[in-house]
């Protein structure tokens, strides 16, 4: 299949404290208007409560996408492969500040980030809870060394988009988070030119 998937072997580990479950997330309506705040734990209980989130897709100079395998300590989708970084703005924090803050906290990276689109989804993970997010998707490019927050990430790998498409079209799709599969399908379908322009 000509896969160029490979584990990221040069990452060094940073022992940063993972986002507290009591941290207040921003509740929104379907138009992304702020309607209140609720703890991270409560947002993920049951069917979930709609809240503001973001997803970052980081590519290298070869056009490969950085994928992370979520920590086994995660309440939702532990050990699943997902996008480069995803999180939530803090209470009273704007999106621009939040995306750059979290990219550095989780991966030790700083790079320009470009907005692509927003999408809303709801997904339940067994009996552990659910995600229900209005998620803004951004892309960026970096060839810098990655510094991993081991509380958030179990492993990293770089994937060429063509190989990733093949993996997602097969039985390997079950190893990926639901939000990543949704957003990547749209990136591949509607925003491939923007990804290629990063190279």
State where each predicted segment sits:
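Nudix hydrolase/Nudix homology domain
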Residues: 4-9, 42, 79, 91, ...
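Acidic, metal-coordinating catalytic segment for phosphate/diphosphate chemistry
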Residues: 15-55, 59-61
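The catalytic Nudix box helix
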Residues: 66-67, 82-116, 138
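A glycine-rich, hydrophobic loop/mini-helix early in the fold
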Residues: 53-88
């Amino acid at each position: 299949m000509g896969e160029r998937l490979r584990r990221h072997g040069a990452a060094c580990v940073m022992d940063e404290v993972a986002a507290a479950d009591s941290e207040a997330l921003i509740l929104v309506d379907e138009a992304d208007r702020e309607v209140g705040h609720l703890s991270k734990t409560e947002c993920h209980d049951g069917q979930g409560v709609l809240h503001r989130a973001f997803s970052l897709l980081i590519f290298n100079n070869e056009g490969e996408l950085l994928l992370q395998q979520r920590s086994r300590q995660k309440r939702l989708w532990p050990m699943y492969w997902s996008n480069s970084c995803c999180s939530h703005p803090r209470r009273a924090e704007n999106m621009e500040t939040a995306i750059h803050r979290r990219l550095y906290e989780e991966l030790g990276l700083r790079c320009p980030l470009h907005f692509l689109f927003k999408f809303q989804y709801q997904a339940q993970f067994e009996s552990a809870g659910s995600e229900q997010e209005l998620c803004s998707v951004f892309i960026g490019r970096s060839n810098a060394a990655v510094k991993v927050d081991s509380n958030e990430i179990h492993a990293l790998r770089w994937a060429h988009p063509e190989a990733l498409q093949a993996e997602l079209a097969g039985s390997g799709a079950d190893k990926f988070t639901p939000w990543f599969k949704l957003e990547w399908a749209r990136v591949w379908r509607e925003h491939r030119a923007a990804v290629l322009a990063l190279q």
